[in-house]
């Protein structure tokens, strides 16, 4: 028997006898043999004991490769399963996943595993790891595993999907599991790991299935990498808008009342209102006419627009009014703004016609996808549509983009990039069928970006079905890539709804419709801001801009109220903390609530008409006249406003 192994650099090695991936790594270099954790054979991940006996392309996976981390984490998940099953014999095991985020294992028992039990399980894992116990890679008859898992409905369901009479499996002592591509040969190679958290997860991700308990963990080859990852996770936890929203009392969601339906508490509503007022003022100044339109619309409108055909799964069921009329909660605002355009006869003199709305919409999101304010079932979109003549498209596009950039500057959004999204030329069936339109509109978008001198990436297959678009992708504080703003060219809806305007020639012409969102939905945008600012909102957005603390309520309460009234009269959001608590506690509470300014008022301040000032995040105390403080906070607010 003679065969060749082709390595990633193109070199070949010839062998007369079969050998394992581990043998091959050792043959190439002793150091590679020590670092090897798995191999890729013809593109498929295989364990070190996998036998090579025919011509193959092989890459050795080491502890320095990303896929090496996946193997390590899969092994840690396997050891967790073995330990958990030993600790809780009645435990049922579901899916296990290892990836760049760590690993997780779905479990189920009458009394689910609680987060407080993780240290005990971690200690048991450490014992198994310290012993360096062998992990056997075995082939087991499927019938044998069926008998083993006969009382575990989840494993039985997974096993039923495995083809063939034998199953590729792994053993650790008496414990057996399957579904792993490759594991390390012994537990001692798991250097650094941590069990992180528990959460509920539907079996196979379907809300109609039972809720299981998902155990999360991670693993690394180096202690420094684990420490850095845990630090990163702590930062993410501290920035999570759901945590901050709870701690600062901004919003809440009660599944008993309605999952994905947030309640805005007074402080959260104040932030949202500040954002909404800013956006409306910005848009009105830019020539938009703000409107209100109904959240319900006749289903026929969405059939005409194509939304019913393309987005039915994301829409709530229609409501039968009993007289043949079917009403639908709107998933998008564009058909509503089309009605605004159609309500009057339009002339070329009316164009560009800019319509904007903070429009409430509803999307049928599955419960498993819901998350705080980021994924909800009811949302308010900062939506706008401009109706233009064909020769106005490029100019209007540039104008919209300029507005977006100005808004980004005011909110200090700097980490973003532009993506031009085109139709897929190899799969044109799912797009509006007009090759000339697509070619023309894509050139318009590209030309507008080039004229502005902006860098962008181009992505085929990312366009909407009715036209190409510009997506502005931002990085969230948690490191996720998210679409913040969108500008879309639409030649289809004006055609479907029969939109026309009278041109200079007295003839009817079809307008082009530009869809645009400056900051997306209020819910997602405020989640984004909460995480970027870590709850410490700039003064112009802060729900409470100044907290007044009288040293003694009886002696200084009247002066505190006078200062409050003076600030409130000028439009600042200010509160007096007159609770019967120690002053130090109230100052710490003001810092915990991330109030930009804390004003302490005592005898000296009352006599001199001054305030003792502390900025959020500092211990420095500054004495200022009330007038000087008013000038300071006024300048602070304006420094974040649209005038700058």
From Swiss-Prot:
An MF annotation (GO) of this entry: threonine-tRNA ligase activity
Cofactor mode of binding and number, as noted: Binds 1 zinc ion per subunit.
Keyword list, A-Z: Aminoacyl-tRNA synthetase, ATP-binding, Cytoplasm, Ligase, Metal-binding, Nucleotide-binding, Protein biosynthesis, RNA-binding, tRNA-binding, Zinc
Cellular component GO terms, alphabetical: cytoplasm
PROSITE patterns: AA_TRNA_LIGASE_II, TGS
Pfam families for the chain: HGTP_anticodon (PF03129), TGS (PF02824), tRNA-synt_2b (PF00587)
Region named Catalytic: 240-538
UniProt-annotated binding residues for Zn(2+): 334, 385, 515
Named cofactor requirement(s): Zn(2+)
GO BP terms in the entry: threonyl-tRNA aminoacylation
Catalyzed reaction equations: tRNA(Thr) + L-threonine + ATP = L-threonyl-tRNA(Thr) + AMP + diphosphate + H(+)
Alphabetized InterPro entries for the sequence: aa-tRNA-synt_IIb, aa-tRNA-synth_II, aa-tRNA-synth_II/BPL/LPL, Anticodon-bd, Anticodon-bd_dom_sf, Beta-grasp_dom_sf, TGS, TGS-like
Enzyme class: ligase
Localization: Cytoplasm
Record domain TGS: where: 1-62
SMART domains: tRNA_SAD
EC numbers for this chain: 6.1.1.3
Job description of the protein: Catalyzes the attachment of threonine to tRNA(Thr) in a two-step reaction: L-threonine is first activated by ATP to form Thr-AMP and then transferred to the acceptor end of tRNA(Thr). Also edits incorrectly charged L-seryl-tRNA(Thr).
Subunit-structure text: Homodimer.
HAMAP family: Thr_tRNA_synth
PANTHER family in the record: THREONINE--TRNA LIGASE 1 (PTHR11451:SF56), THREONINE-TRNA LIGASE (PTHR11451)
UniProt record similarity statement: Belongs to the class-II aminoacyl-tRNA synthetase family.
Name under which the protein is recorded: Threonine--tRNA ligase
Native species: Lactobacillus helveticus (strain DPC 4571)
